Swiss-Prot record:
Molecular function GO terms recorded: RNA binding
Name of the protein: RNA silencing suppressor p19
Organism: Havel river virus (HaRV)
Keyword RNA-binding in record: yes
Region (Disordered): 1-38, 152-172
Known role: Viral suppressor of RNA silencing which binds specifically to silencing RNAs (siRNAs). Acts as a molecular caliper to specifically select siRNAs based on the length of the duplex region of the RNA.
Basic and acidic residues compositional bias, start-end: 9-20, 159-172
Organism lineage: Viruses, Riboviria, Orthornavirae, Kitrinoviricota, Tolucaviricetes
Length: 172
């Protein structure tokens, strides 16, 4: 399913299934390919003897439009160059282009989700609020990727990510 699928064929293909979409295709919101580690690499990194428990290989993120979910695993090592690359994995235009393929005239649910260091944050809204959702996703992604392991754990124990108060104030 890595090829680009056009028009109504895309809706039929994506009927109720999770789909990666092809990197560089006309449908996916992502500009980078999936970089999921292989099973062997994952086991080595997450073994009992590993001292790198607080430094994952990367993070998972997804965009969903109605029943269609596009997901990626991207490598991230915490450096400035890696952060810049990760923040460019999708842009407002690529998300809008992908969404336009699946959003009709009716209100459709849209979601952005990111999982990093064991914490997962999902933002959701209707298709009419997609632009606001994209803005929040950009800030959320930047914030989550810049948190230290202790900050992530502290925010999880409080049940809210850093910056959640700002999102609440802006949405009122």
């Amino acid at each position: 399913m890595e090829g680009a699928i056009q028009g109504s064929d895309a809706r039929e293909q994506a009927n109720s299934e999770r789909w990666d979409g092809g990197c560089g295709g006309t449908i996916t919101p992502f500009k980078l390919p999936d970089e999921s580690p292989g099973l062997h690499e994952w086991r080595l990194h997450n073994s009992e003897e590993s001292e790198d428990k607080d430094h994952p290989l990367g993070f998972k993120e997804s965009w969903g439009f109605g029943k269609v979910v596009f997901k990626r695993y991207l490598r991230y090592d915490g450096t400035e160059a890696s952060l810049h690359r990760a923040l460019g994995s999708w842009e407002r235009g690529s998300v809008n282009d992908a969404a336009s393929r699946f959003l009709g005239l009716g209100q459709v649910g849209c979601t952005y989700s990111i999982r990093f260091r064991g914490s997962c944050l999902t933002l959701s809204g209707g298709s009419r609020t997609l632009q606001r959702l994209i803005e929040m996703a950009i800030r959320t992604k930047r914030t989550m990727l810049q948190l230290t392991p202790s900050e992530v754990e502290g925010n999880v124990s409080r049940g809210r990510p850093e910056g959640a108060k700002a999102f609440e104030k802006e949405s009122e």
